Curated annotation (Swiss-Prot):
Allows the formation of correctly charged Gln-tRNA(Gln) through the transamidation of misacylated Glu-tRNA(Gln) in organisms which lack glutaminyl-tRNA synthetase. The reaction takes place in the presence of glutamine and ATP through an activated gamma-phospho-Glu-tRNA(Gln). Keywords: ATP-binding, Ligase, Nucleotide-binding, Protein biosynthesis. This is Glutamyl-tRNA(Gln) amidotransferase subunit A. GO terms for biological process: translation. Heterotrimer of A, B and C subunits. HAMAP family: GatA (MF_00120). Disulfide bonds: none annotated. Belongs to the amidase family. GatA subfamily. Its EC number is 6.3.5.7. The active site is at residues 79, 158, 182. GO terms for molecular function: ATP binding; glutaminyl-tRNA synthase (glutamine-hydrolyzing) activity. The gene is gatA.
């Protein structure tokens, strides 16, 4: 393993600007590392070495002229949900297998404008539907961290490939999407930092849609500062996305390391759920103690509609998915399975193209939107969503940020929950509220459990206040002193 790839994004960009290392050298090494790790981690879905080296060469030319963007020359991994021009973008689904977009997603375009270098596409749960990266058409991704007895663990989902790539030091940052926790839960499971900004802060244009009102593109990184750097490079108004915010992007990096003294931190009683492992509760209490020691005021708060968040989410998200995924019929792009007539072709194509979990969610979504059940399910879920947002708005009149666990457990063994959808869905219990309310949230490594596996803490802040999120995240990072790394078994 190269020592260079153990560096942070901030450190490597400084070395690139100082001409201590070349972007081409980094890109070449990154490709070799990823290809060597692929047979064991199974984290990647596509490479384009020519594209990678051409982008790296262009970065070197800019740096030689004393130019360059925020992350000039840094190799990045891209979740297989974002269109990268000329590179297969399949959302880890058979129905899009072989699809190579002729356009660039807005998020990746911004990363390239800021100097990022495309390294690879990363595996994910099919169409971002899953919490363990086991529904991918290329098979499960293995977490770089192993269980106490050496068993393979999930990296979380749906952005498990990106989380695994960052945790294994195979790239300097990665993109993910977070619809109900798909950045924050994998970050917690892999000991990385994962960020979901305010809804609309990062553009959804060119990213395959799951649930349009809940989808949040965001970054994975090794440190809070790196995540701020990545989000800075990804954010900004996009006229192609009607939900994109027109607001100026603050200096997220400048917020990292600022004092948290005097900030009021809310601790919601509703997040102390039944059956939560003692280690999760202990990590949460440590986070509270760290922030208190840093000069924060700890305030007990109530978010009374939290108990309805998970069922509301699993009505709203499948409903939007059933609508979004109606466009995949094999007619103009992707795989087509011919039938004896048009309807048979549609049925064959969608039946063969979509995996079981995607089919399950499409059926749930179609059911809750049907004439006899719309009011009973979908409409009520939207009312709950409004109540959840109101709970947060009332809480933020008293506090500046909310602190909770990121996930109800450490990473679990692959296959241990794949036959129990309810147990799988419960992984999102701490994260879905921020999606339903459209609020910024991040997961920061806060320690390890008895088996040495990472645990994460979640910070939620008011809309458009990512700066406070980064301040609090950096304070936890400093206090936790998390430096644990998985033993390298994949090289």
């Amino acid at each position: 393993m190269s020592e260079l790839f153990k560096l942070t994004l901030s450190d490597i960009t400084a070395k690139l600007k100082a001409r201590e290392v070349s972007a081409v050298e980094l890109a070449t090494e990154g490709l070799a590392l990823c290809e060597a790790a692929q047979p064991k981690l199974n984290a990647f879905t596509a490479f384009d070495a020519d594209k990678t080296l051409a982008m790296a060469k262009a970065s070197d030319e800019k740096l030689a002229r004393g130019e360059g963007g925020l992350i000039e020359g840094a190799p990045l991994a891209i979740k297989d949900l974002f269109a990268v021009e000329g590179v297969e973008t399949a959302a880890s689904s058979n129905i899009l297998k072989g699809f190579k977009p002729t356009y660039e997603s807005s998020v990746t375009a911004k990363l390239w404008e800021n100097g990022g270098v495309f390294l690879c596409k990363t595996s994910m749960d099919e169409f971002a539907m899953g919490s363990s990266n086991e529904t991918s058409n290329t098979g499960p991704v293995n977490n770089p961290w192993k269980g106490a007895n050496g068993e393979m663990l999930t990296p979380g989902g749906s952005s498990g490939g990106s989380a695994a790539a960052v945790a294994a030091d195979l790239c300097f940052g990665a993109t993910g999407t977070d619809t109900g926790g798909s950045i924050r839960q994998p970050a917690a499971f892999t000991g990385t930092v994962g960020v979901k900004a305010t809804y609309g802060r990062t553009s959804r244009w060119g990213a395959v849609a799951f649930a349009s009102s809940l989808d949040h593109p965001g970054p994975f990184a090794k440190t809070v500062k790196d995540s701020a750097l990545m989000l800075q490079a990804m954010s900004g108004h996009d006229p192609k996305d009607s939900t994109s915010l027109p607001n100026d992007v603050p200096d997220f990096v400048a917020a990292v390391g600022q004092s948290v003294k005097g900030l009021r931190i809310g601790v919601p009683k509703e997040y102390r759920v039944d059956g939560m492992p003692a280690e999760i509760d202990e990590a949460w209490q440590k986070g509270i103690d760290w922030l208190k020691a840093a000069g924060c005021e700890i305030v007990d708060i109530s978010l009374p509609h939290t108990k309805y968040a998970l069922p509301a989410y699993y009505i709203v998200a499948p409903a939007e998915a059933s609508s979004n995924l109606a466009r995949y019929d094999g007619m103009r792009y992707g795989n087509r399975v011919e039938g004896t007539n048009l309807n048979a072709t549609y049925e064959n194509t969608r039946g063969a193209g979509f995996g079981h979990e995607v089919q399950r969610r499409i059926m749930i979504g179609t059911y809750v939107l049907s004439a006899g059940y719309y009011d009973a399910y979908y409409l009520r879920a939207q009312k709950v969503r409004t109540r959840i947002l109101q709970d947060f708005e009332q809480a933020f009149e008293k506090v500046d940020a909310v602190l909770t666990p990121s996930a109800p457990s450490a990473a679990f063994a692959l296959g241990s929950k794949s036959d129990d959808p309810i147990a799988m869905y419960l992984n999102d219990v701490f994260t879905v509220t921020a999606n339903l309310a459209g609020l910024p949230a991040m997961s920061v490594p806060a320690g390890v459990d008895k088996d040495g596996l990472p645990l994460g803490l979640q910070i939620i802040t008011p809309a458009l206040d990512e700066e406070t999120m980064f301040k609090v995240g950096a304070a936890i990072e400093d206090s936790a002193g998390f430096v644990a790394k998985p033993e390298n078994w994949w090289a």
